[in-house]
């Protein structure tokens, strides 16, 4: 993820060794997760820039063909949690998250979606999502921290992500 919007920042961060190393790690995690149940795992596109109101994402798509003997539900489960929200190595990263974060993530980082009667699947990771609980609206954002992270930059990235949600609240209040 590239956390700030602007062409100069976009060009600088697309060449940033830390951002690139983080992205390579996440693509490798996705390839590994899919390889448990798929063959012909491939990267369909790699490091495309996608622009949003408050952030710019480096996006890659990894896909595979489900093995004939594989259970589709197990294949789905084996991809969670997404490496983009856990880090690597996945199991140890999740243990550290559990120890260090002050509360359970709740819906954040899980998924929402549906399985159609025809076997189709459509799902999304629940990030930058509002959850209403007991009359209180909850939302949260996070960022990937790696050895070469800059604390101020990572905090700015999280604030940029939250900015889109805050803007949505402001717009809803005007309706």
Where are these regions (language model features)?
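A short, hydrophobic C-terminal helix/tail in secreted or cell-surface proteins
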Residues: 2-4
